[in-house]
Amino acid sequence: MAVAQTVEDFLAKHGIDYTLVSHPHTGSSHETAEAAHVNEDHIAKAVIVKDTGGYAMVVVPAGNWVEIEHLRKELRRDFHLATENQLAELFSDCEAGAVPPLGPAYGLETFLDRALSSLANVYFEAGDHEKLIHTSGEDFRTLLGGVRHGYYSHDN
């Protein structure tokens, strides 16, 4: 699979330069970091949550866990993790589990962990389990312009 069409269109719309990093098929963020020879802290991972208001995306470093209780308290919303079936519906142009952390591209409210706010380079899922998109941290933050920033995760 190539880059998910939604992602490709979103990058083009914003005039973002990027490179693709190919790696052997992986099943987790940790495996992806090892296979691509990239520090986990530089890979942005998407976690999809849901409440009565709909879906939202939390973008955190790949080696971190989302602090769901903290998210609930800070935002005063009753979030829980979305199911695999729900993810398949939301990200129909992506392989299961290979969710690109570009909530605005998919029309999702997005929360960006501050741990990703000052990186010079960011890597993220292209929509399959064999490619990462590499872009500058500045361009990544441009793609997520206007999203809420906070501390939403902790180290794994």
Where are these regions (language model features)?
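Extended, low-hydrophobicity, polar/charged segments
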Residues: M1-N156
